[in-house]
Amino acid sequence: MTVELPEGYKPSPKEEYMSPMHLEYFRQKLLAWRAELLQESENTISHLKEENWQEPDINDRATLETDAALELRTRDRYRKLVNKIDSALSRIADGSYGYCDDTGEEIGLSRLEARPIATLTVEAQEKHERLEKQRRDD
């Protein structure tokens, strides 16, 4: 079932939570973000291929290598984000999108608007982070 969104549509708390319109809105948002990240990754690859790695000056070469390492770390971060976006798109397809993995409660439109790949409510995320911090401190 394809839902056509009105131009400028934003999900409203007055609507049924995770209605077909909500799901289509977030699906489109995630797909656009995914496309943007993939384009950035392509740009990084192109840039690295075009770079002159035979820079005669050792300082210039060191700068190039540092910049390349930073670009590759960013690309790796993008790859991980694309995986999370793909997971979110799968949750939209199976009907579990928008609900907390831990509690089953609604994550909330404002949180999903800010972080459409969120899998936990704010409270569950805070609890998770506290537990992680305790494990690191032990």
Which residues make up each language-model segment?
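Interaction interfaces in information-processing and related assembly proteins
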Residues: 1-94, 131-132, 137-138
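Amphipathic alpha-helical recognition patches that constitute DNA-binding helices
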Residues: 25, 102, 116
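Cys/His-coordinated zinc-binding microdomains
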Residues: 30, 104, 125
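Residues immediately within or flanking Cys/His clusters that coordinate Zn2+
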Residues: 79, 97, 118
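Short cysteine-rich clusters marking metal-coordination/redox-active sites
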Residues: 100-103, 121
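Short functional micro-motifs and their immediate structural scaffolds
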Residues: 107-108, 129
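Short Cys/His-rich "knuckle" micro-motifs
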Residues: 110-114
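Cysteine-rich micro-motifs
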Residues: 118-125
